[in-house]
Amino acid sequence: MSRGESASLACLDANVFLAVLIPEATRAPKEEIAGAERVLRALEEGRLRGISTAILLGEVRYVYLRENKSGFEIARAALEAEANLRILPITVPLAIHAAELRRSYYSKKNAFSYNDGLYLATGLAEHADLIITTDPHLLGVTELKSILPSQYRQK
């Protein structure tokens, strides 16, 4: 990245973090786990700026509980301390927009969840350049460029 150029702003889905934190609990293939590691390294080094919604912490906590793993408080502290990651609260406008996005995308063939809507609404509200996810429902959105972690390449 050259001087004066700012790092891309990516909305990060919980599955990107979970692929690194608890790789054995993910259904993501190995190349997506390696891609998630690259994404998080770029975030730590400031080559990528990240945003997410507070639901991130709930999703991460749930997987720690489901997998009967310890270490959530350490993971939470690391996420909250990451200088290049902003975790946004779920505001009323964000919650409403997420519901509208869910209504727009959900069908019997596309189980677009309310959480999916929150990630997309967050990315749109913050004018993110892209969303990084392994979720096929988010990969199909049209309002924001969405990529798999393995597709992330630093500019």
Regions found by a protein language model. Name each.
Residues 85-130:
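Active-site neighborhoods of divalent-metal-dependent phosphate/nucleic-acid chemistry enzymes
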Residues 14, 54, 113-117:
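Conserved glycosyltransferase catalytic-site signature
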Residues 19-21, 63, 98, 141, ...:
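Residues that scaffold the ATP/ADP-binding catalytic core of kinase and kinase-like folds
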Residues 1-9, 120-155:
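Acidic, PIN/NYN-like endoribonuclease modules and their adjacent C-terminal/linker elements
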Residues 17, 57, 95, 138-139:
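A generic structural signal for short hydrophobic patches within well-formed alpha-helices
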Residues 33, 37-40, 55-96, 100:
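Active-site-proximal, substrate-binding regions of enzyme catalytic domains
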Residues 1-52, 64-75, 136:
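Short, well-structured N-terminal submotif of metal-dependent ribonuclease cores
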Residues 49, 84-86, 145:
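Conserved beta-strand segments of alpha/beta enzyme cores
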